[in-house]
């Protein structure tokens, strides 16, 4: 699984973080796939490349809790969720169009055999009457 998380840089008691896409099994400061941005906690500066972050989120990368908060602050998470909702609406609209076409064919096929069972019902009614 691929995650978006922080890797620590900087010196003692003055941290600096890179926001990176990394395999979930890799070490905290291990080799990463791609750099998404940076975070300086003491200065409160966050730099995120939105295009790269959105592309990895759409591919299924899971952000850590801290990174998710940073993405929310920058507005990237909202863009991702909006695009996700929009794609679901489009998918559901296409699904409804396909379902509308199928029942028409089923109704036509269902109406033909319906006449045959009605004759068998009348025969079964006659049998029950004769038993009384």
UniProtKB/Swiss-Prot annotation:
This is Small ribosomal subunit protein bS16. The keyword Lipoprotein does not apply. Residues 108-132 have a biased composition (Low complexity). Belongs to the bacterial ribosomal protein bS16 family. Keywords: Ribonucleoprotein, Ribosomal protein. It comes from the Bacteria. One of its GO terms (biological process) is translation. Residues 82-132 are annotated as: Disordered. It comes from Malacoplasma penetrans (strain HF-2) (Mycoplasma penetrans). GO terms for molecular function: structural constituent of ribosome. GO terms for cellular component: cytoplasm; small ribosomal subunit. Residues 82-107 have a biased composition (Basic and acidic residues). InterPro entries: Ribosomal_bS16, Ribosomal_bS16_CS, Ribosomal_bS16_dom_sf.
């Amino acid at each position: 699984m691929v995650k978006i998380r922080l890797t620590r840089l900087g010196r003692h008691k003055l941290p600096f973080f890179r926001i990176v896409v990394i395999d979930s099994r890799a070490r905290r400061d291990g080799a990463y796939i791609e750099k998404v941005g940076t975070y300086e906690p003491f200065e409160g500066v966050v730099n995120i490349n939105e295009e790269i972050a959105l592309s990895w989120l759409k591919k299924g990368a899971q952000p850590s809790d801290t990174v998710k908060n940073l993405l929310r602050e920058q507005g990237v998470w909202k863009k991702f969720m909006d695009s996700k909702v929009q794609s679901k609406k489009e998918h559901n609209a296409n699904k409804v169009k396909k379902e509308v076409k199928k029942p028409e064919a089923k109704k036509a096929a269902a109406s033909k055999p319906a006449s045959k069972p009605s004759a068998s019902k009348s025969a079964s009614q006659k049998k029950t009457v004769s038993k009384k």
